[in-house]
Amino acid sequence: MSTMTPAEIVSELDKHIIGQAKAKKAVAVALRNRWRRQQVAEPLRQEITPKNILMIGPTGVGKTEIARRLAKLADAPFIKIEATKFTEVGYVGRDVDSIVRDLIEISVKQTREAEMRKVRSKATDQAEDRILDILLPQPRAVGFGGNAEHANDDNNATRQTFRKRLREGQLDDKEVELDLEQPSVGMDIMAPPGMEEMTEQIRSMFSNLGSGKKQRRKVKIKEALKLLTDEEAAKMLNEEEVKTKAVQNVEQNGIVFLDEIDKITSRNNEGSGGEVSRQGVQRDLLPLVEGTTVNTKYGMVKTDHILFIASGAFHLAKPSDLIPELQGRFPIRVELDSLSVEDFEAILDATDASLVKQYQALLATEDVQLEFAADGIRRLAEIAFAVNEKTENIGARRLYTVIEKLLEEVSFSAGNHAGERVTIDAKYVDRALGEVAQDEDLSRYVL
């Protein structure tokens, strides 16, 4: 679990996301409250439930990006899912309980990796011993007394020399033959609605059929060391302990990001067919958000303390169109602002992995030096903003389209301009995009 303070979390998010201070503060406080709750003594700790968040804002302003970056900072089981993927029980589609099943799979993977890191050093030593046993088979005991001891000392000295060479990478390209455990073979089985649990058990049964068998492979020592280290580390793990920790981690620290929640709202001007299904999904989500117990292959998982963050553009619907019970389960509401020209400028140039830096790095691979003048970045931002105003407002995603169109010619003929410098200023932008940006019909289809 992350131990970062809210200010530190916001500072990290600022490196990648421009503006949206209210949303950043809300998710930062929610994440910090997970840690605070762990410091509270029982039985009060059980009574403290997470305050779920509803993020409201147009598309392309940073809702999904906040969730994506939060996942990296959280150091906790995290899943982002589209609410539109789910249907009411009885309809064709995914059951909402599969959210928790997917989350527990992520947690098991995280926990197993964390436990393997703890034993990695010991596992590496054992893997080195196995490789050295192949390279330097133990000599047969011949002779008596001193001769045997002398041979043993020589073998140990040679072994240490080879171990040193192995660690320095001098033997990486040498090939060895190994007997490795065969990985379990996964199977894809189409699951009928509501029968995901049974399907998972069948898949697990088939995957265990080939496990435990050895397979002889010829690999380079560098790869052999990695394969054997993983195998030795896996032997040291207590799988039951991993499962128990994973379930506990989901229950105490799990985060679910529900995207496109506005698409499952009920709207009065529509027919009753879709209405039933959408309301049904909301009612199925309700116990999950409220707190229920879901049966998974790793055991029963309680959702009482899982944090839910929902987001939606709410263009055609309002948050009040959600069923009242579900509205009440998202007490913290945050509105995200539409992006201004200044925001577009900052997105292009001010973030750690800005679009400008990405394209400069891409073209540098062909020895083309791409430079963006301040007035060029400003003009790009103005064009992206204007096109959003005239046509559909897709937020920051418009920048991808605009900059791709701008650099189309340079990217195509980069091989012919090796060693050259290309400067993108306002004149260059107007020459490449001016006509398209001004013609509304053209910009609707091209930008």
UniProtKB/Swiss-Prot annotation:
UniProt superkingdom: Bacteria
Keyword ATP-binding listed: yes
GO biological process: protein unfolding; proteolysis involved in protein catabolic process
Binding-site residues for ATP, renumbered to this chain: I18, G60, V61, G62, K63, T64, E65, D259, E325, R397
Pfam name, any one: AAA
GO cellular component, one term: HslUV protease complex
Molecular-function GO terms, alphabetical: ATP binding; ATP hydrolysis activity; peptidase activity; proteasome-activating activity
Keywords from the UniProt entry: ATP-binding, Chaperone, Cytoplasm, Nucleotide-binding, Stress response
Keyword Transcription: no
Intracellular or extracellular location(s): Cytoplasm
SUPFAM superfamilies: P-loop containing nucleoside triphosphate hydrolases
Primary role: ATPase subunit of a proteasome-like degradation complex; this subunit has chaperone activity. The binding of ATP and its subsequent hydrolysis by HslU are essential for unfolding of protein substrates subsequently hydrolyzed by HslV. HslU recognizes the N-terminal part of its protein substrates and unfolds these before they are guided to HslV for hydrolysis.
Family label: Belongs to the ClpX chaperone family. HslU subfamily.
Assembly notes: A double ring-shaped homohexamer of HslV is capped on each side by a ring-shaped HslU homohexamer. The assembly of the HslU/HslV complex is dependent on binding of ATP.
PANTHER family on file: ATP-DEPENDENT CLP PROTEASE ATP-BINDING SUBUNIT CLPX-LIKE, MITOCHONDRIAL-RELATED, ATP-DEPENDENT PROTEASE ATPASE SUBUNIT HSLU
UniProt xrefs under HAMAP family: HslU
Designated name of the protein: ATP-dependent protease ATPase subunit HslU
Organism of origin: Burkholderia cenocepacia (strain HI2424)
